[in-house]
């Protein structure tokens, strides 16, 4: 008789222990993974920003005698870029940007690693926006010079970085 009560007591105790045992909740693991993703996204944005700034600073170098020629080429900017998916518009213009940089190479002006910069920018853009290329860019009616083009994308990156949670 006592063995039956003891067995019931042990069973109830085990049930209580199992149900009250702390476990990792799905929200805490998803929160930590989303935090890691946000940090990685922040790092990619900062890398993109640095690459664009470095490219712009090399182009604006006082010894760049080819800059007036580079300013004749026109680039298109999105009407309103506010989200990471809008980086598709930047990716669409990387080919023409590479062409302009290749055309303006000379002995007096070398954009060392221009191809490397474009490649890094392309890889970073794909990491940020994803590999989905189905988004069609709505370009602004007015074109921009290469300097304005880079400045606008730099401002875009700074805006996204400043509004993202730290």
Swiss-Prot record:
PROSITE patterns: INTERLEUKIN_2. Glycans are attached at residue 23. Disulfide bonds join 89-137. Keywords: Adaptive immunity, Cytokine, Disulfide bond, Glycoprotein, Growth factor, Immunity, Secreted, Signal. The keyword Secreted applies. It comes from the Eukaryota. The keyword Secreted applies. SUPFAM superfamilies: 4-helical cytokines (SSF47266). Its main location: secreted. It is found in: Secreted. GO terms for cellular component: extracellular space. GO terms for molecular function: cytokine activity; growth factor activity; interleukin-2 receptor binding. SMART domains: IL2 (SM00189). Residues 1-20 form the signal peptide. GO terms for biological process: adaptive immune response. InterPro entries: 4_helix_cytokine-like_core (IPR009079), IL-2 (IPR000779), IL-2_CS (IPR030477). Belongs to the IL-2 family. Cytokine produced by activated CD4-positive helper T-cells and to a lesser extend activated CD8-positive T-cells and natural killer (NK) cells that plays pivotal roles in the immune response and tolerance. Binds to a receptor complex composed of either the high-affinity trimeric IL-2R (IL2RA/CD25, IL2RB/CD122 and IL2RG/CD132) or the low-affinity dimeric IL-2R (IL2RB and IL2RG). Interaction with the receptor leads to oligomerization and conformation changes in the IL-2R subunits resulting in downstream signaling starting with phosphorylation of JAK1 and JAK3. This is Interleukin-2.
């Amino acid at each position: 008789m006592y063995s039956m009560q003891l067995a019931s007591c042990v069973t109830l105790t085990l049930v209580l222990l199992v149900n009250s045992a702390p476990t990792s909740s799905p929200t805490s693991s998803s929160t930590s993974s989303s935090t890691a993703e946000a940090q990685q996204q922040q790092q990619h944005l900062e890398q993109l920003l640095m690459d664009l700034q470095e490219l712009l600073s090399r182009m604006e170098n006082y010894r760049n005698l080819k800059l007036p020629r580079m300013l004749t080429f026109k680039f298109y900017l999105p009407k309103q870029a506010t989200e990471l998916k809008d980086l598709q518009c930047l990716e669409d213009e990387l080919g023409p940007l590479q062409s302009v940089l290749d055309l303006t190479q000379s002995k007096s002006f070398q954009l060392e690693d221009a191809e490397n910069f474009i490649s890094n920018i392309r890889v970073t853009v794909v990491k940020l926006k994803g590999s989905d290329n189905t988004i069609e860019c709505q370009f602004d009616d007015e074109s921009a010079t290469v300097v304005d083009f880079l400045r606008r994308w730099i401002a875009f990156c700074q805006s996204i970085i400043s509004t993202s949670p730290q």
